[in-house]
Amino acid sequence: METVNPDDPRWAELDEKQDWREDGPFDFDEVDLDADEVDRLDFGTLIMTPFDEMNLQLQVDEDTQQVQAALVMHGESALEVAVFGAPASTSMAADIRRDMVEVTTQQGGDVQLAEGPFGTEIRRVIPLQNEEGETMYHVSRTWFAQGPRWLLRGVLMGEAGMTEGVDGPSAVLYEFFCNLVVRRDDSPRVPGDLIPMTIPAELLAQAPDELQQAQAEAQGQPPVAE
């Protein structure tokens, strides 16, 4: 198996080659969402544009009841998106590559770097064991887009995680990722710290009571009545 060198200068050159966010994802201050009549889902930190036959699952921390990530599914493919704090002017790309290569290697997995639609793309195959003790493999492709003090991560899984490029099973999820808008709050954050999302009112009514309570407290609203 080829040993991947995350510090190979070609990856830094690739990341600095162009503005990989020219066609999105966008910062909130870069767009005028009132200029069109598109229906969007506002998760506070992240604003999404839904698409036909989109399925959505929220990943919630059991202890804090904070929404950490969103899993968007289309057919046999899925895209997990999450937002993190980032420096105002320094790229995190090199550190991310280094950390992900190290972690994947420690897990006995295979990791490859390649040119993707947002600079360096990280492709991983990680061995896992199911309940019967059988070895299975988690295959994924990871995208990163960095904006003003934020970093957006997208992890492609399923059919989209096993293909290359942005056509075929990746096409719809690629367009979804490009259409994302990040609204970074003013709170000071250590680079790499997760920035939680808030659930839109139209979806919150369907959530469990404890999640509704936690979301109300996070937004400084009165506790939900029993």
Residue locations for each model-derived region?
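N-terminal targeting sequences that direct proteins away from the cytosol to non-cytosolic compartments
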Residues: 1-69, 134, 159-226
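Long amphipathic alpha-helical segments with strong coiled-coil/leucine-zipper propensity
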Residues: 59, 81-83, 92, 100, ...
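A short acidic-to-branched-hydrophobic micro-motif
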Residues: 69-94
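Short glycine/proline-enriched loop/turn "hinge" motifs that connect secondary-structure elements
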Residues: 71-73, 143-150
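Short, well-ordered beta-strand elements
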Residues: 81-83, 151-162
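Conserved short hydrophobic interaction patches
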Residues: 99-107, 176-183
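Signature of long, low-cysteine stretches enriched in small and polar/charged residues
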Residues: 100-146
